[in-house]
Amino acid sequence: MQKHDGEGKRPLREKVVRSNCPSTSSVTAGASVRIAEFLSPQAIIADMQARTKPEVLRELSGALVRAHPHLQEEKLVEVLREREKLGSTGIGEGVAIPHGKLAGMSQLLATFGVSREGLDFEAIDGKPTQLFFALVAPENSAGVHLKALARISRLFKNPRFRASILEAPTAADIHALIVQEDARP
């Protein structure tokens, strides 16, 4: 039986994916993805102001544009909104991973935000969401995109790690914690 991409349309092949991005330039079908390769400290919001789901998507998009000025905020917001229409990316335990694919991108990019109060993001467990990890990938990057989503999901399943992120006061502290936890085997 042939393996297919996330949409079940194109067969997956064991090959090296090439691009100008460190996150995809040497990723093979079996290689692991490291979050530090696509999340910069400048794209982290230590204390989000958003109070609604649309505001979260806009605030995360704005942070990504500030870190990567070549991106267009409205396009990012629209991509994330369209994905949310398919079903909430609130995975539970206070975590959401809004994500989407954007034409014209050459690399995988991410932004992360902490809502100290938490808000309703229509998470699968019905609990307020406090940790938002948004991921935007090039249009044809199914393998790397899915590996990154899996890596983020695994990382944020750890309750002690989630608690340490909520206690971190600055974007630099949050980034350091994510990089440290992501480096563990």
Model region roles, listed by residue range:
Residues Q2-P185:
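Cytosolic covalent-transfer regions centered on His/Cys nucleophiles
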